[in-house]
Amino acid sequence: HGLYANPTAIDTLSIEKQQQFLYYFYEAQRLIQCEEIEKAKPIVEFCYELNPNDATINNYMGLYAQTEQDADAAAGYLRRAYELAPKEYWYNHHVLLLKSNDKKKQQQAIKQLENLAKTDLKNEELYTMLQKAYIVLKQYRQALIVQDNLDSINGYNAMSAMQRYRLNAMLKNNKQAIKEIERYLEIDPDNYQFQVFRMQLYEQTHQPPEKMIPAYEAILRMDPRNILVMNNLAWNLCLIGKDLMRAEELSRITIMREPTNPIYLDTYGWIMYRLGHCESALFYLKRAIEHSGEKIDKEILTHYKEASKRCK
C-alpha cells in the first residue's frame, strides 16, 4: 500500500539535501522491489533522518517497526504517514487502529474512513475496510449500507449476496436473510452452496413443509445421493400427507443405505403408519428405539406410542 509512491515534502530541504534524499529514497525503493528488505532498512532510516516529513518513508519506518514488534513506534510512524498523505497511506494506519482492541481507536478509524469515503466514492478497498470496521464494532446496519456502495462499484454478485445474508443473520433478521438467499437464487438457481444455505435457514426458522419441500427437491436434483436431504424430504411429504408413495420410496433408500440410523428408521416407520401398514410401522419404529442408544429422541417415542395405541 503506497510502497512505491513518490517522495513528499522535500521542498523544505536544501538543494544538496534534496538530491541526497532522492538518491537514497529511490535506492531504498529499488531494494524493496527486489525484496532485499533488510538491506533497504538502514537506507530508509537515513532517509528519515534527512526528511522525517516524507509520507512514504514514515510508512516504511512503520512497517519495519511492526516487524520488530514495536507497536508504539509503528503506530506513530503509520499515523504520521497518514497525516502527511491520507489518500495514499490510510490502509496500514487504519488496520493498526482496528486491531488495537481499543474502542476509541476503532471509532476514530471509522470516522476517518467515513471522511475518506466521501471524497473517494469508487475505492473498493476503502469501502471493504470500512465495512470490516463496522462489523468489528457490531454496527451491522451500517455495514449493510456500505454493501450498497460496494455493489455500485462491482455489481451485485454471489459475494454480495453472501455478505448481505451474513449481516442480516448477525442482526437476527432471518426473514431478510432468507430473502437475500432467495434473491440470488433467482439469478443463479443452480448454485449448490446457496441452495444449501436456503435449506439451512428454512430449517433454523422452522418453515412450513410447503417451503421446505421445494428447497429439498432443488438440492436433490443437484445431489441425488444426499440421504439426509432425502430423509428430510420424505418426512415433509409425510407431514402434509402429500405423495406418500414417493415419501416411502425415498425413505426406503435411506434405511437401505443406513439400516441402523434411528432417525431414518423413525421416518420410514411413521410413513408406514400414515399408509396404514401397522405391522411394518411398529417394526421400524421399534428398531428406531433399539438403535437410539441411551438417549432416545422424544419424537421417536411419541411416534411409537401413538402407533402402538392405534394399531392394536
Predicted regions and their residues:
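Single-residue signature of alpha-solenoid repeat helices
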Residues: 40, 74, 109, 143, ...
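Canonical tetratricopeptide repeat
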Residues: 26, 60, 94-95, 129, ...
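Start-of-helix register in tetratricopeptide repeats
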Residues: 22, 56, 89-90, 125, ...
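TPR-adjacent "capping" and linker segments in tetratricopeptide-repeat scaffold/adaptor proteins
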Residues: 9-23
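Register position in tetratricopeptide repeats
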Residues: 33-34, 67-68, 100-102, 136, ...
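Alpha-helical adaptor scaffolds
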Residues: 97, 199-205, 217, 227-257, ...
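Short coil turns that delineate tetratricopeptide repeat
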Residues: 18, 52, 86, 121, ...
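Residue-level recognition of tetratricopeptide repeat
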Residues: 29, 63, 97-98, 132, ...
